[in-house]
């Protein structure tokens, strides 16, 4: 799009349905049939509308109700994400592999109206069915419904998403995000696009962005919103063990990574196995700090390394580093013109801006 839209309503009605309906929105590979499925933006928009009909017709007074997603990455995950939001629900992406103690704590806190699940057993299926069986629904429930004829804008500053922290300092906290918070992170994608503009052949199809990080991870969640709002294709992976097969079947130039994945890419590059990575040349780091030497090695071997710093509480839009040189590649990067920064006497970096969360759910002192 010519500018990064600020609402999901515009992203769907203007972007997906009018500006780039014939572009590829998603690809995913199915190993059992050895096929790559392609979904266009106009098809995605119709399925989002089906989900709106589905949720609004099966959940009384749906506005503000919590819809939990417990599933591996899939096209249905994407559809339910956008559909729940446009239905006026509060979306709660959850880590399906957490212990039952952690998961039950989060579910009790959220009090969901529905839990959408892929039906697989991640170690807690029996407990989940016993405690919440009446709320469990399949991920593809939307398919038998007609697309909603009308969509309506949601409250720009209303609670839209609850995303749980990793819980490194105890039980996870629910980070409250509004539409303003999440879509304000669009300036990060614009900054990345500007850095890549002179390096991409615009006569060819738009570069594919590969996603294998789970969608309950902030890095993947921001990718989902950013690429679809911009009209870029997203190649979906659901298991890191299928990484090499996925990127050969679905050529991808860009990929968001955490340190473990960056280190694995680094080993391939340094051992002369760059060909295993296909077209991949832009790893975008999010999460913890990366080893500067690893990043420098990648940059010296044709990779363009990007680092994004900013926890879930800032929608990943806190600080970005495009540096490829030895002096600066180990830094966190530069601040954004869209944010205010302050360093406290004890060294803590404080940030203020539209991307900063609304607060912690049911924990105002957190």
What residue ranges belong to the model's regions?
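Conserved pre-ATP/AMP-binding loop-to-beta segment of ANL
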Residues: 21-24, 146-164, 170-171, 199-208
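Conserved AMP-binding A3 loop
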Residues: 38-42, 160-187
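Structural core segment of the AMP-binding/adenylate-forming
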Residues: 82, 86-155
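Conserved ATP/PPi-binding loop(s) of AMP-dependent carboxylate-activating enzymes
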Residues: 334-337, 344-366
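Conserved AMP-binding/adenylation subdomain of ANL enzymes
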Residues: 183-208, 212-272
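Conserved AMP-binding/adenylate-forming
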Residues: 35-39, 52-98
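N-lobe entry segment of adenylate-forming
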Residues: 1-58, 63, 108
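Gly/Ser/Thr-rich phosphate-binding loop
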Residues: 253-257, 266-327, 340
